[in-house]
């Protein structure tokens, strides 16, 4: 059965939802699923903006057949070539062999790499700032390289103010998009903050003209557009959303966890209302990365393991580096029963491998567990965190 939605009078959502996929990109848990968005423009000429993952191809074709109602598909606009959006290209070409493909040079190169038969079809290669008319609707193509692949572009329908934004402004989950927006951006495109800043600057002249944002994942945005755009601006500058403390602990037998909880209590006693605590072993790293983008301060509490950093904590550090987390104030708590090494190793990683991370001099160092004689260290660290908030 077809399932379509009107975005505007002439633009239809014809995509598909996937509630079977458990790991997005085979890496990120998506318990609420994901949507693959595709948009069909009905004008003097018809145009499909991107396709969907292979798993949603049948639904896409059924939706398109319903909206087209016997009309041919004239154009296929490809903004992004990642397989979860390009997976149905070949079926589109088989169903509508006379369709003209509109995209850019790098995208056509990638289509050939993925073995799509583009050489057998008419193509229109566009460049930055080019325009194209489908009749009533005139669109402008704006290149957005590395948001988050090199071939990415966005398409702006100047007639109705619709921005087809590729993966930008997308979210995990089929519903309640705002809830998952930070987690999506920080993990999927978070590494490329400078490139997001570039596309935001390019879009500066048309921001007041945008009435709809149509991403390739998640809901279409029709309200509070500037709120969402400002969030993207903050995240892509690697600025925290708010002053607060995120405590991440690695604990084998509960002793490091107990110390982390004690620090959280001290911070709350001193008036800090925004404190979040996470077990690095039981929290998916994508959630940790998302929360790291939210808070100004980070506490890393790790047991020493085989004379190194606990593996799950090390993995978290590596992910922070890979996704370009920066400009945070960090406090360290370390534990070990005979060789307390984790603190120095974490500090070395933060100093040498990451950008603009301010590591507080104050530290809590424990031998097996937190004892009363370490209460002063705990109090001093809590005071240092609070003072650094000023």
Q: How would you label these PLM feature ranges?
A:
Residues 49-51, 73-81, 101-104, 163-167, ...:
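Active-site neighborhood of phospho(di)ester-bond hydrolases with catalytic His/Asp-centered motifs
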Residues 44, 55-102:
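Active-site metal-binding motif and surrounding structural segment of the metallo-beta-lactamase
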Residues 175-213, 217-220, 262-276, 288-390:
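FMN-binding flavodoxin-like domain, especially the glycine-rich phosphate-binding loop
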Residues 45-47, 75, 137, 161-164, ...:
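Structural motif
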Residues 4-65, 154-157, 161-165, 256:
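Conserved beta-strand hairpin/beta-sheet module of binuclear metal-dependent hydrolase folds
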Residues 148-152, 168-193, 238-241:
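Active-site-proximal loop/helix segment associated with metal-binding centers of metalloenzymes
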């Amino acid at each position: 059965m077809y399932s379509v939605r009107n975005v505007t009078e002439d633009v239809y959502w014809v995509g598909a939802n996937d509630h079977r996929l458990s790991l997005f990109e085979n890496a990120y848990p998506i318990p609420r699923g994901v949507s693959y968005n595709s948009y069909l423009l009905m004008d003097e000429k018809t145009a499909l903006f991107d396709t969907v993952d292979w798993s949603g191809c049948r639904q896409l074709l059924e939706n398109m057949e319903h909206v087209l109602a016997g009309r041919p598909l004239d154009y296929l606009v490809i903004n992004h070539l990642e397989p979860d959006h390009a997976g149905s290209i070949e079926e589109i070409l088989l169903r509508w062999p006379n369709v003209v493909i509109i995209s850019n040079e790098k995208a056509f190169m990638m289509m050939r790499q993925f073995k799509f038969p583009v050489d057998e079809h008419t193509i229109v290669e566009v460049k930055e700032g080019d325009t194209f008319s489908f009749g009533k609707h005139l669109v402008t193509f704006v290149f957005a390289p590395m948001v988050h692949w090199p071939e990415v572009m966005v398409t702006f329908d100047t007639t109705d103010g619709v921005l087809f934004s590729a993966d930008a402004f997308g979210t995990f989950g089929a519903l309640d998009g705002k809830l998952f927006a930070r987690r999506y951006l920080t993990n999927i495109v978070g590494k490329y903050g400078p490139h997001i800043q570039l596309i935001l600057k390019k879009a500066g002249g048309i921001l007041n003209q945008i009435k709809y944002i149509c991403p390739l994942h998640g809901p279409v945005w029709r309200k509070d557009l500037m709120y969402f755009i400002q969030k993207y601006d903050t995240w892509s500058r690697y600025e925290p959303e708010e002053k607060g403390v995120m405590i991440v602990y690695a604990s084998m037998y509960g002793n490091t966890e107990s110390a982390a909880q004690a620090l959280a209590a001290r911070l709350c006693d001193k008036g800090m209302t925004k404190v979040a605590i996470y077990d690095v072993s039981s929290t998916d790293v994508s959630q940790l990365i998302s929360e790291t983008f939210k808070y100004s301060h980070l506490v890393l509490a790790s047991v020493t393991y085989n004379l190194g950093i606990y593996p799950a904590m090390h993995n978290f550090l590596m992910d922070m580096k890979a996704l370009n987390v920066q400009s945070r104030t960090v406090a360290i708590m370390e534990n070990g029963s005979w060789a307390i090494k984790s603190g120095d190793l974490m500090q070395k990683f933060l100093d040498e491998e990451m950008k603009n991370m301010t590591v507080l001099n104050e530290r809590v160092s424990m031998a097996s567990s937190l004892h009363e004689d370490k209460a002063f260290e705990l109090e001093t660290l809590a005071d240092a965190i609070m003072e650094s908030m000023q």
